[in-house]
Design a protein with these regions (language model features):
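Hydrophobic alpha-helical segments
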Residues: 1-184
Length: 184
């Protein structure tokens, strides 16, 4: 049960109702502070729709954060989003292998992106070696977008956990295929 109410469009001022187009519990809770919700949505919208970073790399990084932090909401939502941009079941299984320190079938760049996401999630910063490995393949713009994407989703999982935002039933199906360790 969420710690703040989920608001419906009729409960908020008309000028903020556009923020509920996605009709997710996250957005319904964030509109308790509509201007903050708009700022949050601006960053999330840029990451998803404005950035020219390879969307598969973006989603692998986000999935890594969600998996590491055992964020059911984040992980399941981004499995669905990731599939829409080319993330395969083999990619998700490879991410799980990489997380456990086992070899995977991923190419070096996606492997390095996952490692960078792990380092930022659990160690605050990406190591020099990982940063250099990724940077050898990405422009300055894409490197900036990647780092800010990982940082943003590290924040998102903390918002989801602190606010105890409930996952929508249609996303729980993902957990049958990819159960999060330690999450029931």
């Amino acid at each position: 049960m969420a710690r703040l109410p989920y608001l419906e469009p009729e409960q908020i001022a008309p000028e903020y109702r556009d923020m509920l187009k996605r009709n997710t519990n996250l957005h319904k809770l964030l509109v308790n502070s509509p201007e903050m919700a708009r700022a949050f949505g601006g960053m999330g919208g840029y990451i998803r729709f404005g950035s020219t970073l390879d969307p598969r790399l973006r989603e692998l990084a986000i999935l890594q954060v969600g998996w590491l932090e055992r964020s059911e909401y984040e992980f399941t939502h981004h499995v669905k989003i990731g599939r829409d941009v080319g993330v395969t079941d083999a990619d998700i299984e490879a991410m799980m292998s990489e997380t456990e320190g086992r070899p995977s079938t991923l190419l070096p760049l996606p492997r390095a992106v996952l490692r960078g996401a792990r380092e930022m999630t659990h160690g605050l910063a990406m190591s020099e070696a990982t940063f250099a490995e990724i940077k050898a393949h990405l422009s300055n713009q894409h490197m900036t977008d990647l780092v800010l994407t990982i940082a943003f989703y590290c924040a998102v999982v903390r918002v989801l956990a602190t606010m105890q935002i409930d996952n929508e039933p249609q996303y729980k199906e993902v957990l049958k295929q990819y159960p999060l360790p330690g999450v029931h």
